[in-house]
Amino acid sequence: MKGYHGKLALLGLLIFMMVFASACSSDKSSSDSKGGTSTDKKEPIKIGVLASKTGALEAYGKQTLRGFELGLDYATDGKREVAGRKIEFIVEDTETKPEVAVQKATKLLEEDNVDFLVGSSSSADTLAVLPLAEEYQKVMVVEPAAADSITGSEFNKYIFHSARNSSQDAVAGAAAIAKKGVKIATLAPDYSFGRDGVAAFKEAAKKLGAEIVKEEYADPAATDFTSNIQKIIDAKPDYLFVVWAGANSPWKQLSDMKVQEKGIKISTGAPDIAALSTMEPLIGMEGFTVYYHDLPKNKINAWLVAEHKKRFNGDVPDLFTPGGMSAAISIVEALKKTNGNADADKLITTMEGMSFETPKGKMTYRKEDHQALQSLYAIKLEKKDGVPYPVPVLIRELTPEETAPPIRNK
């Protein structure tokens, strides 16, 4: 009997140990499926960024990319994570060529399986890519391309335009110079950005009573504007309004051909710092700007300026840096609201009418056409000691309500 009871006790001990081990295993399995460890197993959110890393708009691409990365860091407190999902971004160079932009966007969508597209530096590149956002049902945040047609005739519901558009530029530009009896000529590059820009400016200027007496369109890659400028001189306008993007700007030739000495005042949107360096003859010009680092007075812009200087050898953020930052902030804010859900339909519902804080203050994606309503700045170019280019000095901030463009996607 004693042997029997000993075997029974041993069997009981073995059963207890098996049950205990099973319970421990079950607890471990349960803890692996929830809490902190599950974060590691969540798929990352992938963002495909299209930018001109080469070509005529290379500088714009660089500014946007710097801003986008800074925006991700600002909006996530440096974690690059939302709702337990890591944020990754993949950059592709469009080379400032629409056909290349389509190839690179297709690669991002099919091979990299991105959840968002962002870009591009060129309106022509961007317009070529818009149909892919609809085809693959992915939200695309457009920055810094500005053509009205992005949220107008070529709009689809997957497009959100964080950049300002040509009509917003036009309202600001017309406010600076257009009034009853004023004759205005225009000079712009011969592609969607330039033509949309002039069309919008004409509409705004005519409403204020001005007359458009000459429109000149130059090859976007032109380096000689002699013929265009001479035709403008011959038209004898009071003002020349210039819409331009790219390093091959007409400013030097406008000075060489003494346009202002002939009684024609020049007005434009103040460009990036590199182009401002060529605008010494335009000191005193009144116009507008999308951004200059000294103009917005808010904590996000203060952070941007300080952090940009820290990361980039003392350089200040340039014309399109805050746009890249704003695009990133808007994506992160939307993902916070969806708790990390990157389903396109859920994001669209969330982003329509969504407001978010940026280096330029509050922006709002208008529900009807997904255009970001935002501030622009009426400025005058002035010479400042210690600054090697004409500086945009604030006349007044133009509010999002003042610069709200017509809805053109109907």
List the predicted regions and their residue ranges.
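Solvent-exposed, acidic/polar segments of extracytosolic/periplasmic ligand-binding ectodomains
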Residues: 27, 34-35, 358-410
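Extracytoplasmic "Venus flytrap"
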Residues: 48-71, 92-98, 121-122, 189-195, ...
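Extracellular/periplasmic periplasmic-binding protein-like sensory domains
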Residues: 254-325, 336-337, 342, 390-410
